[in-house]
Each structure stands twice: as C-alpha cells, then as structure tokens.
Amino acid sequence: MNKTAEEIVESRRCASEGLTNALTSITVKMSSVLVVTVILLSYYFARLAIRTLWKNNIFSNSTRLILLVCLLNSIIHQTTMLEIRIRQIYRSIVFASEPCRLPFHFTECEVELFVYYLTTYFSTYSVFSLAFDRLISCYTPKYYLSHQYYVSIFLLFIQLIFTLGTYYVGLYGVPPLGYEPFCNYAPKLATNFVKINDFRTLIMGICIIVTVFVYYLSVKSEKQIQQTSYSPGERYIAYENVAASQSVCILIVLQFACILISSLGVNYLRIFKSTLSDEEYNKLAPFFVGVTYANLCLPLVIHCKTKLTIRNRKLRIGVMTSMYGDVGEHINRLKKSWE
C-alpha cells in the first residue's frame, strides 16, 4: 500500500457534516435500538434452543452438534455487536458537538473487528455444514448413523477452514489505519471486501440448492416407503428424515435471506454510494447487519420447529399405530377387503 493512500485515510480524523448529522440522528439511534432489541431476543431464544436441543432434540446427533456450535458462535457474535452499538451510542451522545471525536480509529476497534468478522464468517458457512450434513445422511445413511460425531466434527473443521481463509484473504495484514463510524465497518484499506461478500453469497446459494435437493429426495423416499412398507417403524423413520430435512432447509433459507442483507446489501450501498449523500449513506448502513438478524432466526427456528415437530410426531405416531397396527393385522384387513 503506497504512502499516499495511508495518509489519505489517516487524515480523515474528523467526521464530515453529513456523517456527524447521521451519527447524531434519530434514525441511527433507532437502528441501534432495533439491533439491541434483536440481540436481547436472540439471547432469550438461544437459551431456549440450547435447552431444546439438549432435552427435546428432534435432529440427529450430528446435526445437533453443528447447531449447538453455531448457537455458541451466535452468542459471541451478538455480544460483540452489542458492545459495538453501546460504544457508538455513548460516543454519539457525549461527543455530539465534537466531530473529531465521533469516529473510531482502527486501533480502537481491532479486537471487535477480529471477533466480529470471524463469527460473521463462521455464521455464514454454517449453511455449508448443515447442507452437507443432510446430504451425507441422505446418500450414506448407514455410515452416517454409525459415525455421526465424526461427520459433524469433519464438517465443522471445514467450516472453520473456510472462516479462517476468508478472514485471511479479506482482513489479515490490513494496516491499522483510518477512521470508521462503527467498529464493525470493514477498514477502508481492506480491498477484497466486496469479493469476499460475493464469495459468501455464492457458497450460500450452492448450499440452498443442495438442501432443497436433499429435501426433495427425502420427500420422494418417504412417499415410496408409504406405498411399499407396512412397518410403522420404517414409515416413522422416513417421516423423521423429512422433518429434519425440512427444518434444516428452513434454517438455511432464513440464514441466506438475512445474510444476503449484509453481503449484497452492503455491496450495493458501496456501489451506489456516489449517488447518495454522506448523511443518507450513513443513515442506511447501520441497518444492514444481516448476521445479527440471522442469529435471531437460528434459535427461533430451532425452538419453534422442535415444538411443532413434537406435536406432529405425536399425531403421526397415533395415526400410524391405530391405522396399521402390526403387519399381520394389516394383511388380515387386506384379505377381508379382497373377499
């Protein structure tokens, strides 16, 4: 990086008039209230989701381990974002009339940036682990059932490699220079930021295709079993596979939709930044925290989908046992119907 570029970012110590107006505006304060509310709700539902996975788990052990790790990651991410927002609100109130003390220097945000982006990328690539966990369970069910923890640990390891690789390409070695209004904003000298967001979007798109395909295969397999098997146990297992695949599919689609807000949304904001005033841009940007929204959806879906599945499971078991009984009873009913 040439010296001129470093001098330029270092010289922008004081907030412009537009940035000052934005940071002290009701709009940005409302965005912080929204984000803090989302974070507090995510804490509540994360507690419920962890308890649900521990006591009333409807997923395989492999999927459960992945979800538990993702929930712990989400708590760390939300806590980091909460600290970032509280610092910004405090500074916007205390230094409202001092534009040169409103922005944060990169060195004031190094810890937050490190934790924030590592947990952000780990959340993004959780869709990879969940999608391929379902794919492996679909194509190699016997191996999957006997090696569930190995499968989940292997997928989580790949997820971690993706996370560290993305952080290395995007932020590792970036000079600690420049000023930002929020500590979660990417440094101005991070030149690969847009490419990273595009790569994250591509990975999530591929994972959605894989998950929808696995869900289709699960539904197709269940229909075949319903037509050819009279064993309540086999029919029940097929139903459970569909329920698990459906839950993971919902999780991934919601994660994708939320994370798309921060990846594509931020990219488009940067592209059209020249058409927006400094004040307009900085009023909109604080709302684009997709991973924070996704970290609320994750425990919410786990908890609500588990309750719904347990209720449907009881109904399904009742229907299967009352309708079919054992195979002998079913054959006797068929004989009577053929007489």
From Swiss-Prot:
Keywords: Membrane, Transmembrane, Transmembrane helix. Its main location: membrane. One of its GO terms (cellular component) is membrane. The chain crosses the membrane at residues 26-46, 65-82, 112-132, 151-171, 199-219, 248-268, 284-304. InterPro entries: 7TM_GPCR_serpentine_rcpt_Sra. GO terms for molecular function: G protein-coupled receptor activity. The keyword Transmembrane applies. It is a multi-pass membrane protein. One of its GO terms (biological process) is sensory perception of chemical stimulus. It is found in: Membrane. The keyword Transmembrane applies. Belongs to the nematode receptor-like protein sra family. This is Serpentine receptor class alpha-24. It comes from Caenorhabditis elegans. The gene is sra-24.
